[in-house]
């Protein structure tokens, strides 16, 4: 009898949690509450958000774009004749951009819409893999749930922020000597090292060693994910009406496409490349597919900074050594290049 009551209670708890998640999923996807409003107000000064008669340039993207020190933040400071609205959110992809688009377009009515894509993990965001041999059970269960309930990823994002704030507060409470040591330990090194590379990237390539190559070359199981990506991107770009708005898709390349040494380095992290020479292509399948999909959309333009980043990298590094993101020099170069490509100066 006791066992039966326990099982019944457990079932009721699971049903309650499941129902709560379904309700949260509906609220999240429909954005009945603007769940990314905090980022909008963090990355944009009040005078930028408020209408002032200037045309608006709306930028949506992931961690390459989010933040005041990104190329979008730099454009905010340099393009005096435009309201540059940075609506990017770290860890998001085209699915999340599609969720937040109705709010952003209704609020800002952009004359230009820039969507930043990243070839390195945009298809990963469409479908998280499961790999029970190289990835922990907890991670596999999380990815399985996140594939079907997108609010799970959002909740994880918010919980991670809470954890980072708590860690930051604890460091501030340390003695000056210990705090200085903690800060020094967190600083990125100037040379690649497996032990220092971004842990998240190492988890991704262990779970799916062919992720980078399959994404860049649109092959294997990622071919289907790319088709979904294009479909969702078309839905997103439909908010940019041709009569009043022109759109740009900025495709950020992976560092291994800019610096060939990172083909070897990514291999040390667990990535697999069967055709490494294809990583040198300037017009690679991920990019070519975008051009083909939107060739009839006269107000949509694909911008490819790969050649510029390669040229800049010959002079100085444009990516961090142990992180897949652009460093401050890379962000500055991208901002200057974009201002020309978007015909803003």
List each language-model region with its residue ranges.
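Serine-esterase "nucleophile elbow" of acetyl-processing enzymes
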Residues: 41-109, 113-114
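Short, amphipathic alpha-helical "lid/cap" segments that border enzyme active or binding sites
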Residues: 94, 98, 226, 230, ...
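Extracytoplasmic/secreted envelope proteins and their assembly/folding machinery
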Residues: 72, 76, 98-102, 230-233, ...
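Histidine-centered active-site loop/cap adjacent to the catalytic His
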Residues: 24, 320-345
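Serine-dependent acyl-ester chemistry module
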Residues: 120-291, 310
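N-terminal secretory targeting modules
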Residues: 1-57, 107-111
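Structural recognition of alpha->loop->beta junctions
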Residues: 286-302
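Short, solvent-exposed loop/turn segments at secondary-structure junctions
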Residues: 64-66, 90-92, 118-122, 253-258, ...
